[in-house]
Amino acid sequence: MTKWFDTNYHYIVPEWHADTQFSAHPERIIAQIREAQAQGYAVKPTLVGPLTLLWLGKKKEDFGCRIKTLMPKLLPVYQQLLQAIADAGVEYVQIDEPILAADAGKPWLEAFPSTYQALAQAPVRIILGTYFASVAEHAALLNSLPISGVHIDCVRAPEQLATFVAQLDSSKILSAGVVDGRNVWRANLRQVVANLQAAKAKFGDKLWVAPSCSLLHSPQDLALEEKLDPEIKSWMAFAAQKLVELGNIKQALQNGLDSVQAALEASDAAVADRASNSKIHNAAVQTRIANLPKGADQRGAPFAERIKAQQAQLHLPLLPTAALRSAFESRPAAT
């Protein structure tokens, strides 16, 4: 297991061999699509992209470039999966390629055009999703791909919004991730709406508002929390509340700020209170920090000297500690 990029969520790392074979098993996702459709939702499924899937895997053997060896076998399976999703009545599919925000390397970037040319043959409209960091340097690449739109993380990298407003063709969809999918705090709705005005002017109805990333990183529903301090609770938004925030942002963009005045006022009050509340802002601590002498945040000796002194005193083995966090939790907390 390893962490999903820089989050605290983990995934089982697949191991790739030169003779690895892939096959499509769409039954589970099709069942989930049908369930959502039965409740009246227009479904936009999300898949991990083929380039990210191969990049994140563990190469078990030295068989050369994963792109050249495995991608020709993987792409037909993605095409089958997309066809099955299209047959279920889905118009849009989001395919996430977060490696664009990582240092994937030139061969992986060069593989995007051919990969998405192949995926574009499926009868669905593809939104290519990115998150956790800026992909502004790849705006031209993304604009050139045969896709219907791009999702960007405007929470972790708000500065990239201007780049995509300038460089993304207005015929494409810009999905702006403006509500933080990774924390528990309410968004500053008024500020978000203001930040989106230029994008709204260019893209019109092709501007989508979205969480910055999957909401699986947030708790489900704040309404289920009955023991939180009411004041602190008023600053929070879990996944269910973040969806409401997105609805308010959409309405404000379409119909003006007056159409969501009550929501804006509640957001303003929560943001202002959290910014100054004494429960989380300790004036005494702030004063102590401000009065720290110069160099108080620096070590007295470099690491090379400290490690020698530590070893001379403690005689530690190579791996002195190794523990999982769950080992320190009680069973009720762990379960």
Protein language model annotation of sequence segments:
Residues 1-335:
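Domain-level signal for soluble alpha/beta catalytic cores
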